[in-house]
Amino acid sequence: MLSLQTLAKKVVACNYLSSDYDYTLQRFGLWWDLGPIHLCNNCKQIFSYKHLQCFSEDDLCLEAALVKAVKSDNLELIRLFVDWGANPEYGLIRVPAVHLKRLCTELGGLTPVTEPRLLEILKEVAKLKSCAGVLLGYDMFCHNPLLETVTRTTLDTVTYTCSNIPLTGDTAHLLLTKFWFALALRHNFTKAIHYFYKRHKNHLYWRVACSLYFNNIFDIHELCREKEICISPNLMMKFACLQKKNYAAIYYCYRLGASLDYGMNLSIYNNNTLNMFFCIDLGATDFDRAQHIAHKAYMYNLSNIFLVKQLFSRDVTLALDVTEPQEIYDRLKSYTSKNLKRAEEYLTAHPEIIVID
């Protein structure tokens, strides 16, 4: 049960007050980083008064706020955030000083933090889907001695499950850096992306690969505008074709000069027919090569369809001629493949060519 003082602080923090009350809020313990603390009663995010809406990139979940308070050795705020619902175990992950560890334990944190619980917290942080959550995860887990006992196989499995992207790295630190960077790129958390890239300039290739894999052309557009990319458009197309329905990324690579025939063939290799038909809709025409690849991949129905070359043609409505990311997303929002529809109609009308596995 919350004490009367803690409850009063929570009520005050959940309401906006004018700057006339700044001194009172400071004396009341609701002041942090040169500004008053505000707690959203609905989403439990903590943010400053400069934001009058939740879910900005500077918002902090209670756990992220707790870790930040532990780092700054702010005992009063540690107690306050735990009283408001933050899990005190999060304060123990970074192996804090003895007095901070003792406080977090007194507030309910269990020590020692077991390996299963450590990995469970890693997954919890990854699921926060916020800029602050990504930066929190990087801060908590990279260079963390608690992870030294975790096997590489276990860590690989956990990070792949959370990101759905194969990760590589010689060390656990490098693996986790790529992991949190990938999550920032997946959700286009620009503040986190810039934070990582400023510290890890050597990860440009990884940044491009992840952005294309996650269909994040906002980030690719920014890199192109700043002339940071020195990777061939066809190699970029390779990353874009790995994920299903990566239409915006495929289109952007095409606008940069990537071959649509290459994208079509890559999509067949990846058993990704929706991306393949998108490339055809954009203007891919090398159906002889596509038929050969489909046949070698035992995709006989697709191989037979490619024998009817006159079936396919470019979709003129996709002649977008735009490069602004938001406009590309908007134009493709209602996209459906005309060539896919023709192929389905042809198979329905000619059941004799269908090969049943």
From Swiss-Prot:
One Gene Ontology term, aspect cellular component: host cell cytoplasm
Pfam name, any one: ASFV_360
Keyword DNA-binding on entry: no
Keywords: Host cytoplasm, Host-virus interaction, Inhibition of host innate immune response by virus, Inhibition of host IRF3 by virus, Inhibition of host RLR pathway by virus, Viral immunoevasion
GO process annotations (BP): symbiont-mediated suppression of host cytoplasmic pattern recognition receptor signaling pathway via inhibition of IRF3 activity; taxis
Localization per record: Host cytoplasm
Protein's UniProt keywords contain S-adenosyl-L-methionine: no
InterPro entries, per the entry: ASFV_MGF360
Function statement: Plays a role in virus cell tropism, and may be required for efficient virus replication in macrophages. Also inhibits the host cGAS/STING-mediated type I interferon production by inducing host IRF3 degradation through the proteasome pathway.
Family: Belongs to the asfivirus MGF 360 family.
Quaternary state and interactors: Interacts with host IRF3 and TRIM21; these interactions mediates degradation of IRF3 through TRIM21 and ubiquitin-meditated proteolysis.
Protein name: Protein MGF 360-14L
Natural source organism: African swine fever virus (isolate Tick/South Africa/Pretoriuskop Pr4/1996) (ASFV)
